[in-house]
Amino acid sequence: HNDLRQLMVSTDPPYYDNIGYADLSDFFYIWLRRSLKNIYPENFSTMLVPKKEELVATPHRFDGSKQAAKEFFEQGMSKVCGQIHQYAIGNIPLTIYYAFRQNDMDEDGMASSGWETMLTAIITAGFSITGTWPMRTEKPGRSVSIGTNALASSIVLVCRKREAADATCTRKTFLRELKSELESSLAHLQASNIAPVDMAQSAIGPGISVYSRYAAVLESNGSPMT
C-alpha cells in the first residue's frame, strides 16, 4: 500500500522449525529460474532460494545448535512485531493467526513456550491483545485429525497499540481485574457456540487481554511476572 498511514497487517507467521518454507520453495524455484532468469535477473540471481534471513528455527543453519536457532527465531519475531508497531494506527487492528496445536498444551493444560514466545513478542512491541477467536482452517477429515479430538487449527489474535505504552501494574491488580472480567467473558464465549474442545484455548483470550494492557505485571518484589 502506498499510504503507510492506512496500513493493515494480517499475518500467519512462521512457527519455529515447523515448516521450512525456503527449502520447499527450491522445488519450484529451479524451474522458474530456468525460464525467467533472463527476464528477472535480480530475482533469480542465486542458484537456490536465499535462506539466511528466513525466520525459522532450523538448527542445521546454526552448526546444529538448537539454542542458537531458537534465539534467532525469537529475536526475529520480536523485531518483526516492533516494525509492525511503527506503522500500526489506532483504528486498524493487527491480526495474527497462531496455529495452536495439541502439543502446545501440556498435561496440566498450560501453554507451551511457542505460545509464550508469540505473546511476549506482541506485548514487548507495544501491542495490547484485545480479542482472541478460534478458527477452523483445516479440513475436518484431514489425516492428522481423524480419530482425534483436534483443537481448532488457529487462533486469531486481534491486537491494537497499547494506550499507555509503558504502563505497569502489580500482580494483585492484575488478578483483581482478571477476576472481575473473566466470568462475563467466558459466558460470552459459551454463547458463541464454540466447540467444547476449543474452550480451554479460547479461555486464554480474556486472560491475555487483561495481561497485555500493561508493559509488565510486577510481582511484590518488583520483578516481572512470567
Question: Where do the PLM segments sit?
Answer:
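S-adenosyl-L-methionine-dependent nucleic acid methyltransferase catalytic domains
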Residues: 1-226
